[in-house]
Amino acid sequence: ELSSKAITSKTRNGKDMLYLSFMPEIDDVYEDSEKEYLFLIDISGSMMGVKLSETKRAVIECLKQLDEGDKFNIIAFDHQFEVMSAHALEYNEKNMQEAEKYINSLRASGGTEILNPIKFALYENTEKVILLFTDGQVGNEKQIIDFVKEHGKNSRIFPFGIDSNVN
């Protein structure tokens, strides 16, 4: 059985925004397990302005939904990438405040290179939930898909397109 939710809102510049969520019921055993979440945030030049500000807001809202015991980290990328922390952080109030401060400090510049942050995210081959926020149109999507197929068997990746031109 699916649980669904729809939220409509206006962006700061008056454009309509729609968020849809469809969640299957999951066994309690899976529900209670601690998870590791990685948030990959595109900070390339094309994300400047409302795209990046709305992405920041969305990531902060996602972080607030984590449970005690969950772990998380944030990877910001343009033509290179940086990691908020050298290791996954346990979700708690202090780390949430640090994450908000880090997210709000991000600035857009550079090109879009998605493969290297994905390689980093999947390096340990442990079970992770990866949320990818990008407006990118990449030329190496086959290489990215092939890498994820080979190395991402234990992880779930959820891409969020921040525009209508994402590939």
Residues of each region from the PLM?
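Exposed acidic/Ser/Thr-rich ligand/metal-binding surfaces
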Residues: E1-N167
